[in-house]
C-alpha cells in the first residue's frame, strides 16, 4: 500500500513537472513570437527579394546567404501564427532542417531553395528520415516544386507521412489570401483522405 502511495505521488510529481515544462516552453514561444512579430507585407517583401537574389536592402546575395534569409523567413512565418518550433532551424548551404509542433503532432521540416525541381533522391532521403522517427511526420518545402516522377515514386505503395509545399503555396500566404494554418490543414486533410501529398492550395483563396 505504501509502495502504491509513493508511486502515485511520484507520477503526480512527474506530471506536474511536465506541465510546468510545457508552460515554460509555451511562454518562451509566445515571447519569441512577439519579438519577431512581422506584418504580411514585410513577409511578402522578404520573399520577393529572395526570388530576386537580394536581401531587404537590395544587395545581391549568394546561395548560402539566401538559405539563411529563407530560414529566417520560415521561422517568422511559423512563429507569427503561433506554431511551436520545437527544434531550432539549422542551415547547411541551401538546406534547412528543424521541427514544429502542429495540432498536437510533431513534424520534421526540411526546406530547400534550389533553382530546379527537387528530385527523387532528396525526397527519398527525407522520407527515410521521417520514417525513422516514432509516429514521424514531415513537411518538405521546395521553393521550385517537385518533379512528377519523384512525387509518384514516393507515394506508390508507401505509408504517407510527408506533405509537400512549394512557392505556389507560400506566395498566397504573403498576399493574405489564406494563412499558414489553413494551408497546412488543407494539405494534411487531402493527404489523409485522398492519399495525395502534393496538392495546389490556391483553391483556398476562392
Question: Residue spans of the language-model regions?
Answer:
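Mixed-charge (Asp/Glu-Lys/Arg
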Residues: 1-206
Amino acid at each position: 500500500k505504501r509502495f502504491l502511495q509513493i508511486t502515485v505521488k511520484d507520477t503526480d510529481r512527474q506530471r506536474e513537472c511536465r506541465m510546468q515544462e510545457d508552460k515554460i516552453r509555451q511562454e518562451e514561444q509566445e515571447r519569441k513570437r512577439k519579438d519577431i512579430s512581422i506584418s504580411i507585407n514585410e513577409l511578402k517583401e522578404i520573399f520577393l527579394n529572395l526570388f530576386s537574389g537580394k536581401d531587404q536592402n537590395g544587395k545581391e546575395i549568394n546561395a548560402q546567404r539566401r538559405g539563411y534569409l529563407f530560414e529566417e523567413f520560415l521561422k517568422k512565418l511559423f512563429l507569427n501564427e503561433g506554431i511551436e518550433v520545437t527544434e531550432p532551424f539549422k542551415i547547411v548551404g541551401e538546406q534547412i532542417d528543424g521541427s514544429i509542433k502542429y495540432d498536437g503532432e510533431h513534424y520534421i521540416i526540411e526546406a530547400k531553395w534550389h533553382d530546379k525541381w527537387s528530385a527523387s533522391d532528396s525526397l527519398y532521403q527525407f522520407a527515410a528520415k521521417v520514417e525513422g522517427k516514432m509516429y514521424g511526420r514531415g513537411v518538405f518545402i521546395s521553393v521550385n516544386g517537385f518533379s512528377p516522377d519523384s512525387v509518384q515514386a514516393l507515394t506508390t505503395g508507401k505509408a504517407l507521412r510527408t506533405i509537400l509545399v512549394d512557392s505556389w503555396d507560400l506566395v498566397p500566404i504573403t498576399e493574405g489570401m489564406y494563412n499558414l494554418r489553413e494551408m497546412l490543414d488543407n494539405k494534411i486533410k487531402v493527404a489523409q483522405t485522398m492519399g495525395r501529398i502534393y496538392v495546389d492550395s490556391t483553391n483556398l483563396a476562392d
